[in-house]
Regions:
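N-terminal intrinsically disordered, cationic/polar leader segments
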Residues: 1-107, 111-155
Length: 155
C-alpha cells in the first residue's frame, strides 16, 4: 500500500464551523425586576443533539436553558443553541458516536458558556458562569439507560 493510500485511510477530524444556531433572552418583569435585591435561584438545563448533514459531516448542538427566579417571578430566561459542524472521516463506527457526543460537545461548551455569560451581562444582570460539564459521563449514563430500556422491552 502506498503512503498516500495509508494516509487517506487514517481517521481525520476537522472543525468546519462553530456558531450560535439560536439565541433567546426573555425578561418578563422588566423594568421592575431590576429593583429586586434578592439573589435569584438559577436553574440550568442542558441537552445535546447530533445530526448527520452529509457523508462524513455532522452537526452537533448543545441546547442550554438558564432560568433565574426570585420566588415565583422569572427574572430572566436565556436559551442558547450552540452548534458546530464537524467533518469526521475514516473513524471506526464504534468510535464515531462517542466522538460526536463527547469530544465535539467538549469543543462547543466553552463557546456556549461565553455566550450565556455575555447575554446575562448585556441584559443588565450578573454574569452566569456555567459549571463544567462531564459529557463523557452524560454519554455513558444515556447509553446505560438505553441498554436498560432495550433489555426491559425484550423481556
Amino acid at each position: 500500500m502506498t503512503e498516500a493510500a495509508q494516509e487517506s485511510n487514517q481517521p481525520a477530524f476537522n472543525i468546519e464551523k462553530v456558531y450560535v444556531r439560536d439565541l433567546s433572552l426573555e425578561i418578563p418583569h422588566a423594568p421592575n425586576i431590576f429593583l429586586e435585591r434578592e439573589s435569584p435561584q438559577i436553574d440550568v438545563q442542558l441537552s445535546t443533539q447530533t445530526e448527520p448533514i452529509e457523508k462524513d459531516v455532522y452537526e452537533v448542538m448543545i441546547t442550554n436553558t438558564v432560568t433565574a427566579k426570585v420566588g415565583e417571578k422569572v427574572m430572566f430566561l436565556i436559551e442558547v443553541k450552540q452548534a458546530g459542524i464537524f467533518q469526521i472521516r475514516n473513524m471506526p463506527p464504534a468510535d464515531l458516536e462517542p466522538t460526536l457526543a463527547v469530544m465535539c460537545s467538549n469543543i462547543l461548551f466553552p463557546y456556549l458558556r461565553e455566550v450565556v455569560s455575555d447575554v446575562a451581562v448585556r441584559a443588565g444582570f450578573a454574569p452566569i458562569l456555567l459549571n463544567p460539564v462531564n459529557f463523557e459521563r452524560l454519554y455513558q449514563t444515556r447509553q446505560s439507560k438505553l441498554q436498560t430500556e432495550s433489555t426491559a422491552t425484550t423481556h
